[in-house]
Amino acid sequence: MRIRVDLKVDEIPRYWYNVLSDLPFKLDPPLDPKTKQPISPDMLSAIFPMPLIEQEVTDKREIPIPEPVLEEYAVFRPTPLFRATYLEEFLQTPARIYYKYEGASPTGSHKTNTALAQAYYNKISGTERLVTETGAGQWGSALCYSGAKFGLKVNVFMVKISYEQKPMRKYLMRLFDGDVVPSPSEKTSFGKSILASNSENPGSLGIAISEAIEITLSDSRTKYSLGSVLNHVLLHQTVIGLELKKQLEVLGEKPDVILGCHGGGSNFGGTVLPFIPDKLSGKEIKFVACEPTACPSLTRGRYDYDYGDTAGMTPLLKMYTLGKDFIPPKIHAGGLRYHGAAPIISRLVKEGLIEAVAFDQDEIFSAAKLFAKLEGIVPAPESSYAIAGAIREAKKAKEHNIPRVVVFNLSGHGLFDLTAYI
């Protein structure tokens, strides 16, 4: 029998959880790209509205969710928690496998959680237009949807290889009145310089970020919006983990392992960060970030200051990085093709509180196809890395005959990614 836990609408979290307040260490500050000195909040105001800058640097533990954002969350939240009983039976594992399903959102992924928040704060700050990048299109779709909800224009630079691989997502963005172009593009000086050196450049998130920031800095009524990496983005995503804690309590379950795919860190962070205090208090719980072997920021990157974009326009962040000029192979998980990682996640990996594992594309698509046939949900290529990780953990439980509780975040559906399955 299918086991699922659905919370009531009035059980949507009323606050976002800020893990920085509970960590026994401070993160290294972002540095000014010109002076290489710690950047002040005021210096970020050219690209972000002040409420989001305040959330980026605050050490307050709980940040109230504004009522207009809660009203929009209620369209799709709380999202369900399922037990993957069919997958368990197939694997013949003593592990109990659960997955939180974020594909229930209006645009099919977890990205809407922060897109709505960022659109709201920009609207009340007087912003008229948002500019952003997107890889596979989940983030761009979410921001276009949220911009339409709060009356903002949205321009999206979509990584070229994903723009070509995933046409349905650009159509979805345009449905919500978004303006989407492939990156590198002819719309910016940086894009033109990239194309001049290589007209066949497949693009990267780093390049798309540079283009978005260049446009942002040219217009005082325009702000930049980022779908991952930064503290305030992970903050908004903690609604996932906060709901998950309640749902596991309903079942009387305590997780042994929590997994999520990892690109920049937003869905993984949103899932695991609310459980970090449990780990710090001595509870045995393992957190596993699942990333591509083709873009192994956490498993093979260096821990150092680096730019968040290719042109070197962003503040320098202390993070695991493959280098700002790294151009990942053309894998289908476009949302994971980022050279860096969230400073919060990076530091937790450095401190040994989070583990990271890399998977190749063949393994994750085998896991994704199996999951779709057994559980009835076609996962996004990105989310499939978490599925592969969960299957690996379930097999370990079988090998050692240990009934472990394995939980992962299924961050989005793959109905716009079906060509990847061919």
Swiss-Prot record:
Substrates-to-products reaction catalysed: (1S,2R)-1-C-(indol-3-yl)glycerol 3-phosphate + L-serine = D-glyceraldehyde 3-phosphate + L-tryptophan + H2O
Transmembrane residue ranges: none
An example Gene Ontology molecular-function term: tryptophan synthase activity
Enzyme Commission numbers on file: 4.2.1.20
Source superkingdom: Bacteria
GO cellular component: cytoplasm
Pfam families: PALP (PF00291)
Pathway the protein acts in: Amino-acid biosynthesis; L-tryptophan biosynthesis; L-tryptophan from chorismate: step 5/5
N6-(pyridoxal phosphate)lysine modifications at: 111
Named cofactor requirement(s): pyridoxal 5'-phosphate
InterPro entries assigned: Trp_synth_b-like, Trp_synth_b_CS, Trp_synth_beta, Trp_synth_beta/beta-like, TrpB-like_PALP, TrpB-like_PALP_sf
Keywords: Amino-acid biosynthesis, Aromatic amino acid biosynthesis, Lyase, Pyridoxal phosphate, Tryptophan biosynthesis
Described function: The beta subunit is responsible for the synthesis of L-tryptophan from indole and L-serine.
Subunit description: Tetramer of two alpha and two beta chains.
Similarity-based family: Belongs to the TrpB family.
PANTHER family to which the protein is assigned, alphabetical: TRYPTOPHAN SYNTHASE, TRYPTOPHAN SYNTHASE-RELATED
Protein name: Tryptophan synthase beta chain
Annotated source species: Pseudothermotoga lettingae (strain ATCC BAA-301 / DSM 14385 / NBRC 107922 / TMO)
GN (gene name): trpB
